């Protein structure tokens, strides 16, 4: 038993050992196989890498050899380039072929379009030649006054020929009837044909049905609907006939044919479009007034084959005829006057409507032109006149303004406006005549009641806001007049001017008067200085001109040379006295007007005209400055300078010569300064003039010719007007050695000899005292030929120290200024 059991145990053990060995062998085999697979893969990768390296080596070898052997390289590169070029050429050829094909297709489409258009035109001609079969309504046609039952051919403008033209959509004019018959629309006849008869022309319902299209040539009256009881205006001349001018919409609503279209000639008659057109027009009628159903409820024509078709619009025919007849009766009784503006209009082409009813709206263009002229005139002329009349304080200025307003409405724009003259020429008892408002200056002028012959280009609209803002554009009106003016004309007084001279200078004078009024608005009394100083000049006769000028007791002495007069005419001696009360009164308003004046002085080059007006006798109003000083710089010849030392009656306050030469610069725009500001400044100026008249002789008039300044230099705008009221002009003798233009005015090179002689010291004095400035003229100078009999004068100038500092800051290069506090 034991042995048997041991044998069994040994067998089991052996079996287990065998099994374990097999498993171990199997595991070893699996592991070895996996390792073999991995080794094979590694070897394959290595071989592949070696192959790639070999390929790269061979390729590199080929490249090196190709580079080393040039003939071989050329032979090898050429085929490559040829291949590339052939590829590109193939693409280009394909593109070119495609382009050519597209062009051919486009040309074919164009030819097809042209063929379609030709076919449509041919169809249109054939339709025009068609005749209706009117046997069913033959008896009605015999009673008709028309020779046949056809339609009027509207495409033949006003010819009155009869045909059944369904192409009336292309008609441009409404034909006149040959007799007292009505021109019924093709729609009316087609509707009647569907009922079995043709409408006679004398049928009241027929007339009322188409009363928008009726025209009675014998009586000259036109029967219209109640809603259209007015002559047609250009934008609603014939709403009824405009039914064919609408866009065509298909039943499905997808296809829309804009008018005008070649399809209108045929498609408008097709039933495909009738329903949509009718509903479209009915929708429009729902929004219009009841009386306008006649105008808007117009329906397109029908083809002969579709005349017997019943469509829902014919159901409304009895009611529509009744309403139309009632409206027609009311229209014949009374036509209330109404403006030429329609209530509604479905007309999309007003120009064609004008042509259609040209006989009914013949007066419309005239009314439109009148409205345009009135609307253009009122804002420019009348508004400014009303604003100016509001600023007036005396009745004497309101009358000519109203007169000018009335005359300007009736005047023609080609000839300008009639100018009324109520301004006294010599008497200045009413200061408003010269100082109140700008428009008074422009109205009065120098031509008393004379009609300006200048065109609107040469003499711009004086009433416009541009004209009262700045005299820039007005300058060109008198440039040429200045150059051609002689000394004889300058000597003549304003009252003794010849009519020829007045005519030639009228535009220039009015422009200069406007410019001078604007010049005066920024006068020295309206100080831009922060302290509000006033510069006053007093003329003292019978004094020696050659005098040394001193500032204080210890200041350097400076010689100031004064330029001689530019003309040899003798003027009455006048003394101007400006009181301290005037100075104090206007000092208070200086700060208030500084901003306006700064805007006024920003446009510096537009203000050169004031430089020409520096020597003005006090008896001449500022509006006359141009008449006295219209000679150009070329007119200042040596002969005129020879007699130019009559300085006792002239204001010597002047700008430098090189600034005055800038007078001939190009004029600029007139839109910078609003005319309300100009009117306010004119009002302030009027107050100053009224106060100054209390201290002036009856025949004297205080002028401030340098209240208005212009230059291109960068001197301060705040002290610009006062600066030109305090500087002395330079002399024109051989000693004037100041030849440099410190502000770069290239136009002043011709007058460099006129600059002031520069002193070696400046006058930036802090404690300057009162100084009398005397005019230094070279007595006995051969170049001037001064005689002892000529009058002597000197000017006493007072200005604040603050103003002096500002002037010297910007002007120290051309003059030395001595001021007193």
From Swiss-Prot:
It comes from the Eukaryota. Residues 584-593, 601-615, 639-649 have a biased composition (Basic residues). The keyword Translocase does not apply. GO terms for biological process: negative regulation of canonical Wnt signaling pathway; negative regulation of JNK cascade; regulation of Wnt signaling pathway, planar cell polarity pathway; Wnt signaling pathway. Residues 388-400 have a biased composition (Low complexity). A motif (PDZ-binding) lies at residues 818-821. Pfam families: Dapper. Residues 88-136 form a coiled coil. Residues 401-432 have a biased composition (Polar residues). Keywords: Coiled coil, Cytoplasm, Developmental protein, Wnt signaling pathway. Its main location: cytoplasm. Residues 288-312, 386-432, 564-615, 627-655 are annotated as: Disordered. It is found in: Cytoplasm. One of its GO terms (cellular component) is cytoplasm. Involved in regulation of intracellular signaling pathways during development. Specifically thought to play a role in canonical and/or non-canonical Wnt signaling pathways through interaction with DSH (Dishevelled) family proteins. Binds to dvl2 and may regulate the degradation of ctnnb1/beta-catenin, thereby modulating the transcriptional activation of target genes of the Wnt signaling pathway. Seems to activate the canonical Wnt signaling pathway. Interacts with dvl2. The C-terminal PDZ-binding motif may mediate interaction with the PDZ domains of DSH (Dishevelled) family proteins. Belongs to the dapper family. This is Dapper homolog 1. It comes from Danio rerio (Zebrafish). The lineage of its organism: Eukaryota, Metazoa, Chordata, Craniata, Vertebrata.
